[in-house]
Amino acid sequence: MEGLWTSMVLVIVGWLLGVLSPAMIEIIRRQRDYPLLQQSLRADLAELRLLLALSAIGLKTAQGLLDRELLEWQRDVLSSHRGKSDMAKMLERTNTMLSYSDADLSALAAFEAQNKVATGHGLKKFSAPTISAMIPTLWQLPRGLQVELLEINQALSHLNEEVEYAQYYFRLTFENLASANHAIAKANLTSSYMNIAGMATRLVEKIDHVSHL
């Protein structure tokens, strides 16, 4: 009888090991790969944050909205950047502009608005390759990080929809439209640019508050 129980126990233990081994292997693999994944996500978000901020600043500058507050935000973004892009020279220029008097800064804002090259044709959709690639497997990440990355991905999708509108309105400004319709297209383009600037700014703030990396 004792031999029978021993055999049954061994069978059960063998079955459990067969069932649990893949799960245990997966857990070990995740623990091994997670630091590399964290590093990749940090780099991806850092570059996205920088691009979003500079795009928002550029769009506002083109509308004559360059001021000390905007430059201070630019300085903070550049000085806290931890990505691969070297922003030392831009940070130096930003600090130089912050040393200007209010009158000189106002003159600079007017000059930049008048001479800013139209940005519509160069305004491209934003992307976060690592996040996009991970969407199907986000369940493997800590719950809090899942939520934060999904929120960023959703906000990025909405932002890119607005970029499409801006690209459309930009193309319209070059078409042979009646004067009134051309004015409407330009107004819509400006409105779209400001929407993008606002959405990009909020997304930078969202990235800054990612707390699970």
In which residue ranges do the predicted regions lie?
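Membrane-embedded hydrophobic alpha-helical segments
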Residues: 1-31
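Juxtamembrane membrane-water interface segments immediately C-terminal to a transmembrane helix
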Residues: 28-49
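Interfacial alpha-helical end/capping and short helix-turn segments at domain and membrane boundaries
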Residues: 43, 47-213
